């Protein structure tokens, strides 16, 4: 027979009930929680973080500094030396999507991850060790203003092609 299941929803503090034969409730949008390693841009619509690896194989998370509601930067080794700057622009009225602009000021390996907190879409840009990206101006992101588009996408900054090992994009 069917079984009654429960799932806690941290957004509203409620316990949601459903039958085992029914699909689980859709996940609630994530709230963007700004902390030392996370930027919340476009009024908390986008969660932005970066991880890095240097030439001595040391790893870490970039330390975030918000510059405005649409931009911020990250430092890796010294708070006085920015390593990455990121901007997310609301271009909904002109192109129907959000634009992502960023520039690395370092040649360490890094993975920049931008997540839409409403749709849970995730966009990752990978910069390989030893490569200094000349910047990235992405005006055709997966972040459509109507919430459509793939759930995930990953790009290698050397080619702007999907990163090796990236699965086929799935519609969200």
Predicted feature descriptions by range:
Residues 3-172:
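Polar/charged low-complexity regulatory segments
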């Amino acid at each position: 027979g069917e079984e009654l299941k429960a799932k806690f929803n941290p957004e509203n503090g409620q316990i949601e009930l459903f039958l085992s034969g029914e699909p689980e409730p859709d996940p609630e949008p994530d709230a963007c929680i700004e902390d030392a390693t996370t930027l919340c841009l476009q009024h908390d619509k986008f969660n932005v973080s970066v991880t890095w690896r240097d030439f001595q194989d040391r790893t870490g998370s970039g330390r975030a500094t918000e510059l405005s509601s649409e931009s911020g930067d990250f430092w890796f080794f010294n708070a006085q030396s920015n390593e990455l700057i990121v901007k997310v622009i609301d271009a909904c009225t002109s192109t129907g999507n959000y634009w992502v602009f960023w520039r690395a000021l370092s040649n360490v390996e890094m993975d920049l991850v931008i997540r839409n907190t409403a749709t849970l879409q995730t966009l990752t840009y990978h910069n390989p060790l030893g490569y200094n990206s000349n910047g990235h101006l992405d005006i055709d992101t997966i972040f459509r203003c109507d919430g459509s588009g793939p759930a995930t996408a990953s790009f290698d900054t050397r080619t702007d092609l999907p990163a090796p090992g990236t699965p086929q994009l799935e519609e969200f």
